[in-house]
């Protein structure tokens, strides 16, 4: 496995055998390699993301039945579709297509990612929990429900995501092994050692004293960005590749790409409103991660990589 020289003082970590730089200090040195250029107009970028998001939502609307008790199923429907979409479902579809698969092969997994993201978002925006931005305008629909619904319903949404995966199995196409592998990927990513662990650490970080060293650096954001957004997007890319019948090296290259893309999203989301010094440091880390992500795509030179600029485009 190639480990790129970041020219910074960092401690390596590994997630699913993927090298992850642990940024701990500033550096005025740049990467020695020249990043690969992938260009796409801003209009095309939004068009690709909007198109795949619309396809995923259409698939979900066919899959979700609003039935009694309405207090559960109607709220589930509203929570899922009012949650701002992230890049993971689109990345899952793009990875599948890159390795020769069709969008339909990845649609159930992409929809499950959308569903589980909604559950995570709901838990992140519970009122009166001390979490960052618990009253975000984006969570207005969620916060219109009673706290007991907000607290318990995400735990019902997650199994629905796994149900989507299980129901996508088709014995006539001999894909049971791939579906099972994707389910395992999901359990690792969204279980107690994945997203839940990241949410716990983010909760701890929200309690930092405003004068503490941790509160004045971007270091506290590394672990949540790694285990939350990073792990989710790594899972998305790997699952898309698996469902597209990729070989192992392709799966791992796309997993690594997804990890870096997710971490970019994590740092951008956490430090977009930070002080000038924090924002500058976060931007430096994002630039490093962007270059690393581009390096992973070099393996796929000669294929249609245009959609992948969607995931490196700074919103």
Swiss-Prot record:
Give tissue specificity per the record: Mainly expressed in trichomes, and, to a lower extent, in roots, leaves, flowers and stems.
Kindly list the GO CC terms recorded for this protein.
Answer: chloroplast thylakoid membrane
Binding-site residues, Mg(2+) 2: 124, 130
Q: Which UniProt keywords apply?
A: Chloroplast, Magnesium, Membrane, Metal-binding, Plastid, Thylakoid, Transit peptide
Its name, as the record gives it, is Heterodimeric geranylgeranyl pyrophosphate synthase small subunit 1, chloroplastic
Q: According to the record, how does the cofactor bind? A: Binds 2 Mg(2+) ions per subunit.
Q: How does the entry describe its membrane topology?
A: Peripheral membrane protein
Q: What is an example of a GO molecular function annotated in this UniProt entry?
A: prenyltransferase activity
Q: Where in the cell is it found?
A: Plastid, Chloroplast thylakoid membrane; Plastid, Chloroplast
| Principal subcellular localization | plastid
Q: In which residues is dimethylallyl diphosphate bound?
A: 228, 265, 280
Signal sequence: where?
none
**Cofactor(s) listed:** Mg(2+)
What does the sequence similarity comment in the record state about its family?
Belongs to the FPP/GGPP synthase family.
For whether the record's keyword set contains ATP-binding, the answer is no
Per UniProt, Mg(2+) 1 binds at: 124, 130
On subunit structure and binding partners, the annotation says: Part of a heterodimeric geranyl(geranyl)diphosphate synthase.
Q: Organism source for this protein?
A: Cannabis sativa
Annotated transmembrane regions: none
What is the recorded function of this protein according to its Swiss-Prot or TrEMBL entry? Heterodimeric geranyl(geranyl)-diphosphate (GPP) synthase small subunit. The small subunit alone is inactive in vitro while the large subunit GGPPS1 catalyzes mainly the production of geranygeranyl-diphosphate in vitro. Upon association of the two subunits, the product profile changes and the production of gerany-diphosphate is strongly increased.
The chain's coiled-coil residues are: none
